[in-house]
Each structure stands twice: as structure tokens, then as C-alpha cells.
């Protein structure tokens, strides 16, 4: 994710998480830790060809990595792009990043009422380890805590959905890395 991605990501964030969307300040703070030799964050965006020949944001994701533990901070996919494998691609890129950062485990929280996301994480090998009561506010929704040990060995499942996911996923400091990118979309950091 680059500075010019913050506004489009905020727009999608508000659509996806209307009750507890991240603020611009929070994204800027995260991006401040995504550069340089001491970087502890990586944020990705996925884009598809938009109207008028430009690119349109269709997804994003972020990881924090400190002390050998990675934490999936966020993953969001435009509703019309769900079940196309984009969430799996973003998650796979974030797990590869966790391995690059030397993480021995990756943690995340997911809403207890978000069964599709839970299934995605379980397909990658995440296990349920706990619950955070009232974690998501203001709705007072509980969070399921999940963990993946050894992200370097994580299995990357095949996407369950239709074709046409993004061509590539780019991070905050790299170029597209997919060896078999789907047609029509690109990602960048």
C-alpha cells in the first residue's frame, strides 16, 4: 500500500466495516512502520481494471510482525469480488511476508459472525485458540482468536470460487510476486 492508496482503502473500509472502520490516522500510522530496515508492517492492495481505463481497488490486507509473531491486522475484499480467490491470495501473500519477517506464528481476530472468513483461515491451517468478548465495538461483537504455527510451511489452498481474481498482489515495498496471476487484476503495496 502506498500513500495514494489510503483514501480508496478508507472508502472500502467504510463499506466493509461500517461500525468499526479504521481511521485515516490508523492507516497512516501503520504505513509509517512499513518502510525501511526496521519495518514491522506490510500492507497490500489489490486492483482491477476500472471504468475509464484506470484501476479500481477491490481488496487490501495488512500484517504486523513483532518478536517472532505476526498478526493479520486486516483483510478486506469488495463484496462483488468475494469467492474469487482474492482473500486467499491476500492472506497467502501476508503469510509469505510473515515468513520473510521470521515469524514462527501468526495470530488474528475475526468476528464470530463472519463464518466465510473463519473458513478461509481454517483452510490455511489456522486453529481457534480463544475468544475476546465484546472486541468489536460499538456492536459489542465477540472476536474469535486464531493462530497459525510456522507460516513458512502454511498450505495455500486453491480458491473455491469463480475465475477472474486480481492479477497480482503488491506490498508496500515490492512488485507483483505471483507466478500464476489470475487475469484482470493487479495488487501493489
Name each model-derived stretch.
Residues 3-4, 8-82, 91-101, 149-153, ...:
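Acetyl-CoA-dependent GNAT
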Residues 25, 107-109, 122, 127-144:
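Conserved catalytic-core motifs of GNAT/GCN5-like acyltransferases
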Residues 77, 111-112:
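Short amphipathic helical patch at the helix-1/turn junction of helix-turn-helix
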Residues 85-87:
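Conserved G/P- and acidic residue-centered "switch" motifs that form tight phosphate/ATP-binding loops
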Residues 91, 113-117, 134-139:
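Short glycine/proline-centered loop/turn elements that form peptide/ligand docking sites
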Residues 101, 119, 123-124:
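Structural motif
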Amino acid at each position: 500500500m502506498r500513500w495514494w492508496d489510503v483514501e480508496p482503502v478508507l472508502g472500502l473500509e467504510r463499506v466493509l466495516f461500517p461500525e468499526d472502520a479504521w481511521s485515516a490516522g490508523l492507516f497512516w500510522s501503520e504505513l509509517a512502520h512499513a518502510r525501511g530496515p526496521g519495518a514491522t508492517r506490510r500492507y497490500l492492495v489489490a486492483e482491477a481494471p476500472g471504468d475509464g481505463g484506470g484501476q479500481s481497488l477491490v481488496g487490501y490486507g495488512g500484517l504486523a510482525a513483532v518478536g517472532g509473531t505476526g498478526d493479520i491486522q486486516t483483510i478486506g475484499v469488495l463484496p462483488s469480488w468475494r469467492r474469487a480467490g482474492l482473500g486467499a491470495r491476500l492472506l497467502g501473500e501476508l503469510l509469505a511476508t510473515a515468513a520473510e519477517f521470521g515469524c514462527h506464528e501468526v495470530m488474528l481476530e475475526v468476528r464470530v459472525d463472519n463464518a466465510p472468513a473463519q473458513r478461509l483461515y481454517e483452510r490455511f491451517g489456522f486453529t481457534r485458540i480463544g475468544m475476546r468478548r465484546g472486541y468489536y465495538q460499538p456492536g459489542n461483537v465477540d472476536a474469535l482468536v486464531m493462530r497459525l504455527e510456522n507460516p513458512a510451511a502454511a498450505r495455500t489452498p486453491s480458491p473455491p470460487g469463480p475465475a477472474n481474481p486480481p492479477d497480482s498482489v503488491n506490498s508496500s515495498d515490492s512488485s507483483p510476486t505471483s507466478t500464476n496471476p489470475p487475469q484482470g487484476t493487479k495488487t501493489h503495496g
